[in-house]
Amino acid sequence: MQNTIRIVGIDPGLRRTGWGIIDTLGNSLRFVASGTVTSDGDMDLASRLCQLHDGLAEVVHAYKPDEAAVEQTFVNKDAVATLKLGQARGIAMLVPARAGLHVSEYAPNAVKKAVIGVGHGEKHQIHMMLKILMPKVEFKGDDAADALAIAICHAHNRGSNRMRQALAG
């Protein structure tokens, strides 16, 4: 008998970190909640990271996910921005890990491929597929939508991993 697994997807960012919660049972996906955690750009970096930490900790505490998935970051030409994004990503991985959750990581192209079928796509395609896959989905902004896509990517990968284990066993 399968159990419902609750997944939190996290799209890390220093200004806005998106989060999305889904429940999965077999191949079935159900939207639970989504949103963003923001940091105050007028504050110093350490304070902003604390804001992200505290906001994500509230989400994890409130929704009690079983597993977490975080999008990997890419390196861009602005080294300072890349480092700051990496620090925000560290917070995005730390919070669920400290709550005892297994944290998986996915490249942006893998997330898009899992949701829209190709590794390169537009935001509106992700939004459309979220509405098809989970008709009751609600999200405000790209960050929350991306976080839901990350959670879906993890749900699909969990299914593939279970299939491989069953065939090998």
Swiss-Prot record:
One of its GO terms (biological process) is DNA recombination. GO terms for molecular function: crossover junction DNA endonuclease activity; DNA binding; magnesium ion binding. Binds 2 Mg(2+) ion per subunit. Keywords: Cytoplasm, DNA damage, DNA recombination, DNA repair, DNA-binding, Endonuclease, Hydrolase, Magnesium, Metal-binding, Nuclease. PROSITE patterns: RUVC (PS01321). Pfam families: RuvC. Mg(2+) 2 binds at residue 71. Its EC number is 3.1.21.10. It catalyses: Endonucleolytic cleavage at a junction such as a reciprocal single-stranded crossover between two homologous DNA duplexes (Holliday junction). Its cofactor is Mg(2+). Mg(2+) 1 binds at residues 11, 143. CDD domains: RuvC. One of its GO terms (cellular component) is Holliday junction resolvase complex. Homodimer which binds Holliday junction (HJ) DNA. The HJ becomes 2-fold symmetrical on binding to RuvC with unstacked arms; it has a different conformation from HJ DNA in complex with RuvA. In the full resolvosome a probable DNA-RuvA(4)-RuvB(12)-RuvC(2) complex forms which resolves the HJ. Belongs to the RuvC family. The RuvA-RuvB-RuvC complex processes Holliday junction (HJ) DNA during genetic recombination and DNA repair. Endonuclease that resolves HJ intermediates. Cleaves cruciform DNA by making single-stranded nicks across the HJ at symmetrical positions within the homologous arms, yielding a 5'-phosphate and a 3'-hydroxyl group; requires a central core of homology in the junction. The consensus cleavage sequence is 5'-(A/T)TT(C/G)-3'. Cleavage occurs on the 3'-side of the TT dinucleotide at the point of strand exchange. This is Crossover junction endodeoxyribonuclease RuvC. The gene is ruvC.
